[in-house]
Amino acid sequence: MKVTLFIPCFVDQFFPQSGMNIVKILERLGHTVDFPDAQTCCGQPPFNSGYWDEARVVAERQMAVFRDAEVVVISSGSCGAMVKVFYPELFHGQPQEAEAKALAAKTFEFSDFLVNKLGVLDVGARFPGRATFHDGCHGLRELGLKKPPRQLLQHVRDLQLVEMKEAETCCGFGGTFAVKFPMISTAMGEVKCASVAETGADFIISNDSSCLMQIRGILDKQGNPAKTVHLADVLAQT
């Protein structure tokens, strides 16, 4: 299968190794991977801030870039939800609605693609350590991705997966929320990191890099040596 990658801004700018590891995993499974250079932001920041006209401009560009893709895989539940759930809403009743729905139908968050599209649970990974998983809000609530990441992690050799208390609670990032309400954002993050600390985990894993960046910053401030790791970075290890 030819898989086209939709790489979120945070991965592109701050965590490119996570995108490269998705390529590594998909090629290990026998798939061809394509990365269109013309892709850009999914448009979520203006959409969430109420600038829907501006968000449509960005979304239209993305729809054009991925128009001919067989299947689109994205390394973020947040950006994945933007495409799968909110693109059709953004263009509801407009000429581009059909194209928005078409892109939504062929777009998958990475763990969803592996488990529910390909039927793969074991990618041959080995990652020694004790880890806990953080559910990003959009991936969990908009895409329903509670099980797929955990199913994949349960098949990673030498990985001890422990559930943190209230794993589904927001880390406090929320995109522009962290900028508009920094004190609330930090307080929410501190609650999340307290749950992390209780597990005694060496690693905090998530399928959203933005959540991991928020958690990493607070853990560093608290002096907690636990490391944040994207799901793809775990699954790429052998």
Predicted segments, located by residue:
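Iron-sulfur cluster-binding electron-transfer modules in prokaryotic oxidoreductases
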Residues: 1-238
